[in-house]
């Protein structure tokens, strides 16, 4: 892990825990090695650094290309491992970069919805993340951030001291159909979309509190 990244993560962790009374649940679920995708909901500009500080491994982020137009913002984003991507989903270069990072054993954070939710609720996933999962074959770790839409709503420049929670789900591998390699056209696109929808479903299953231990059934 690069020294600059480690330093920035430390600052964000201090900010997250002191200003937002932040809590992180199930961070130990992240794989210790190998490439994987972190898939999270997106409701605020606070999300990328807050999700990144919760990860024990260095992560790479997909970020909207328009955020890089200012040279200073672009430099900061790139130093924080952000990769510019076009919102319309047609950025072949960014997709190749994602696949290369995953192939090199890196953790890549993606937002399946493609943009911030306007009201804090989960939105429909786009097929792009499904395509990357299919082409890379890596596992996906669903994660969810709670409260950032209230901490930094749309149109606001300064964050409020609202409590935040980041929670990780179980890593999972998508069960591809037996004939996946033969699929083409609309049938292949349907699988990509189904992968994306499954990821969003698992994100939606996460709740902002610790998991309850399973109760052992008593024998009769």
Residue ranges of model-derived segments:
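Short Gly/charged-rich anion-binding patches and loops
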Residues: 10, 25, 71-72, 96-97, ...
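Short, basic, glycine/proline-bearing loop/turn elements
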Residues: 11-13, 79-85, 112-116
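Catalytic core of membrane glycerolipid acyltransferases/transacylases, capturing the structured
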Residues: 17, 27, 31-89, 97
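Non-catalytic C-terminal accessory region of glycerolipid acyltransferases
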Residues: 3-4, 93-220
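Short gly/ser/thr-rich secondary-structure transition/capping motifs
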Residues: 17-25, 148-150
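N-terminal membrane-anchoring alpha-helices
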Residues: 1-21
């Amino acid at each position: 892990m690069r020294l600059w990244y480690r330093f920035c993560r430390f600052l964000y962790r201090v900010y997250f825990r002191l200003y937002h009374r932040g809590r992180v649940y199930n961070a130990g679920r992240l794989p210790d090695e190998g490439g994987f995708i972190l898939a999270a909901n997106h409701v605020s500009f606070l999300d990328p650094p807050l999700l990144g500080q919760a990860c024990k491994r260095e992560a790479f982020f997909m970020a909207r290309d328009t955020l890089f137009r200012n040279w200073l913002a672009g430099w900061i984003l790139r130093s924080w491992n952000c990769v510019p991507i076009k919102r319309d989903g047609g950025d072949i270069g960014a997709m190749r970069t994602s696949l290369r990072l995953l192939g090199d054993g890196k953790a890549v954070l993606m937002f399946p919805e493609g943009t911030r939710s306007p009201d804090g609720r989960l939105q429909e996933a786009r097929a792009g993340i499904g395509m990357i999962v299919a082409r890379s074959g890596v596992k996906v770790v669903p994660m969810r951030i709670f409260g950032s839409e209230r901490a930094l709503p749309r149109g606001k420049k300064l964050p409020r001291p609202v409590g935040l929670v980041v929670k990780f789900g179980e890593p999972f591998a998508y069960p591809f159909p037996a004939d996946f390699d033969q699929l083409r056209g609309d049938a292949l696109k349907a699988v990509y979309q189904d992968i994306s929808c499954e990821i969003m479903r698992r994100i939606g299953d996460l709740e902002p509190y610790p998991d309850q231990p399973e109760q052992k059934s008593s024998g009769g």
